[in-house]
C-alpha cells in the first residue's frame, strides 16, 4: 500500500484561498511573494478569472513567464485573454498596486518545470530601470514588454497570434511586442506587414530566413532588416528565383537588401546556405558589413571568382573564430583567398570546416603555412577532399604536432570492413586531421582516421 504525501502548509493555505475568490484577492497584499507562482498556476488550471486578473495587477516579480504554462492551444488562448484583460486594468491605473513589479510578459515556450525556479521570474529580457526621467523631470513609465518567438509563413497568423497583435496595437504604446528569435519561411508581406510594423525590431537578436523563392519579398523586407539594430545572428537558407527578372531588376533587389547590412553593427554570426539568388553578389553583402564577424558559414554555394577573391578583403572577415565552407567546391578556384583569410584570422580562428570542398594536393599545400599560424585552431573538418598520403602526413605532423608537442595522437581505421587488407597496411600512419579536443589542464587528444592506400575522397 502506497502512502500519499500529506499536503504542505503552503498547499493547504493556497487551496483555502482558491475556495473564496474575495478572500484570495484581498490577501494578495499580504501573502509572501514565493506563494505567487504556485497560486497563479493553480488559479490558471481552474480558470479562476477574477483571481488571475488580480494577481497580474499585483505580480511581485519583473517577469511573468506564461510560456512555461503552454500545454494545450485552446486552454492557452483563454488564459492569455484573461491575463491581457488583467494587464489592461493594470495599464489603466494611475497608481499601480504597491506590490506590482511586472515589466515583462514572457510568452516564449519553455518547459513547465522552469515555472518552479525563481530565476525565470527575474529581469531577463527587461530593462534594469523600469522608469526613465522625462523632460519635465517626472518619471515616465516604460511600456510593458510582451516577449514572443515568431515563425512567419506564407499563411496568415493563427487566431491567438492575431489576437495578440491586435491587442498590442490597440494599447497606444503602453505595450511593446518583442521577439528575440524570428523565423521566416516563404513569408507573405500581405499577411505580415502589420506585425512587422508593430514589432519592436530592436528586440530581434536572431533572424532565420528559409525558402524565399520570390526576390520581391527580400525587397519588401529590406527596410525591416535594417531596423534590427541588435541582430546578432542571421541565417539565410535556400534563397532562389523562380521567375525571370531583368539584370537591372535583380540588381535593385540585391542592392536594397544587402545595403541594410551596414546598419547591423551587432551582427556576430552569419550563415549563408544555398543562397543561389545572391551568387555572384556576395562581395556586395560583405562590403556593406563593417562589423567583424565571429562566425561565417558559406555552405553549398557556387561561388563566383569575384565572390571568392573578395571574401578575404573585407573587415567583416578579419577576426573570425569559426569558418565553415562546407560543400563549397574549390577545385577550380585559387587557394590564395583562403590562405589570406586564414592568416587574417590566425590569432582568433578556433574551428575550420572544409568538408566536401574537393580540394587537391596543390591547394592544401598552398594553405599549410597559413594553417600553421592558426594557433587557436581546435577543430578542423577535412572530410571530402582529394589528398595524397604525403600531404596528409605533412598536415598531421607539421600542423597538429606543432600546436602541442604533448598531443596524444590516436589512429582509427576508416573502414569497417578490412577484407583482403593486411593489418600492417591498415596500421600505417596514413592520417587525416579530423578533430582536436582541448581540455583545460589535461593532455590534448588529436583524433585521426587511418586510410588504407592511394588517393581517396575522405
Swiss-Prot record:
Matching InterPro entries, A to Z? LRR_dom_sf (IPR032675), PRAME (IPR026271), PRAME_domain (IPR050694)
**Localization per Swiss-Prot or TrEMBL:** Cytoplasm; Cytoplasmic vesicle, Secretory vesicle, Acrosome; Cell projection, Cilium, Flagellum
Gene, per the UniProt record: Pramel1
Name listed for the protein in its UniProt record:
Preferentially expressed antigen in melanoma-like protein 1
GO biological process: one example: negative regulation of DNA-templated transcription
Question: Gene3D superfamilies, per this entry?
Answer: Ribonuclease Inhibitor (3.80.10.10)
The task this protein performs is described as: May play a role in acrosome development and also in sperm maturation and motility.
Which GO terms of the cellular component aspect does the record hold?
acrosomal vesicle; cytoplasm; motile cilium
> Chief subcellular site?
cytoplasm
Tissue specificity field: Specifically expressed in testis (at protein level).
The family annotation for this protein states: Belongs to the PRAME family.
What stretch or stretches form a coiled coil here? none
Q: Which UniProt keywords apply?
A: Cell projection, Cilium, Cytoplasm, Cytoplasmic vesicle, Flagellum, Leucine-rich repeat, Repeat
Q: Does the keyword ATP-binding apply?
A: no
Q: Which organism is it from?
A: Mus musculus (Mouse)
Top-level taxonomic group:
Eukaryota
Map the LRR repeats onto residue numbers.
99-126, 176-200, 201-227, 228-263, 264-289, 290-321, 322-340, 346-373, 374-398
